[in-house]
Amino acid sequence: MTAMVLVVGMLAGCSNKGSSDGSTSTKKEDISEINLTYVKAPLNVPSIIQKQDDLFGKEFSKDNIAVNFHEITSGPDQTQALAAGELDFLHALGGTSAIIAASNGVDLKILNTYSRSPKGFMILTNNDSIKSAADLKGKKVAGPKGTVLHQVLIAALDKAGFTENDVEFINMGIPEATSALAEGSVDAALIAGPTALKAINAGSTVVTTGEGLVDGIIVTAVSTKFAEKHPDIVKRFMNVEKETLKYINDNKDEALEKVSKEVGLTIDQTKEMYSWYDFSMDITDKDMEELEKTQDFLIKNEMQENKVNIKDLIYTQK
């Protein structure tokens, strides 16, 4: 992963339009729009439901606040846009990307855990001779650098007694890595979510998943400046997140039917994948330990130079 762009601009969305939310006890700076990412892969059920059912729009339209979704899936691209003031919330950001961005000076806070899904992150191959991570030695492996998937590769190689230097790692996005695997130009690929399931159904085999290697933590992050100016908006945003999870838990079949159509899987495939995920928002002690381990991984593999205090990255509700 290349270094983050450190341009910090004025936050998008501020205007002179007033807010009619009578619940705020302190006068806050007026706002006309909220900008957040929309990342539906690997299987981000809450985000899909929130967009399809316009849950954020319904919450903030009462105050004439527009909600704009931006389909930016790359962690570095998300954090660069946040730093430039183009985004307010990063809704499904890899823990790796959050830590690297913070270490490079991007002013963000982690609001909550978005998901944990060690089984959802996989190394796949079409090469019958590759049965385990040890068999990857000397092989071409494609995938996105500095991500949870990359962390799975490094951890799997380490467990087998090897390092990344023992493979020919090619940095590319999941769609490109999937195509490269199908074309035979690489021996293995780092793939997640529905794309992985489709590849398996097409004949690819699993070398390993992240289970027992990483927790696969994805987080929701916010611009620190935005959070300081609009703590009421942040609180309401998190309330929508909580209400979304309650709806999904109370109406699982209905929710997963919507999701299956969006991601192009059968309902049975969607249910299978959903069972791999933990979408609970609370940041647990185990999550904090995993984020610390992630930082150690990033520093050890020279993807992060400046160590950060993970506890300082966690947002404190005003």
Annotated model-derived regions:
Residues I49-I65, H150-F169, I200-N201, E257:
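Ligand-binding cleft/hinge of the Venus flytrap
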Residues K28-Q52, G146:
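Extracytoplasmic "Venus flytrap"
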Residues T24-K28, T125-K140, F226-P231:
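Flexible hinge/capping segments at coil-to-helix
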Residues T96, D166-S260:
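Pocket-lining segment of extracytoplasmic ligand-binding domains
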Residues G22-I34, E59-E71, E86-D88, K159-N171, ...:
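A local structural motif
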Residues M1-E33, K318:
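Short, low-complexity disordered leader/linker segments with a strong preference
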Residues N44-Q50, H70-D107, K119-A133, P175-A180, ...:
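Pocket-flanking alpha-helical
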Residues A41, E228-M303:
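Secondary-structure end/capping motifs
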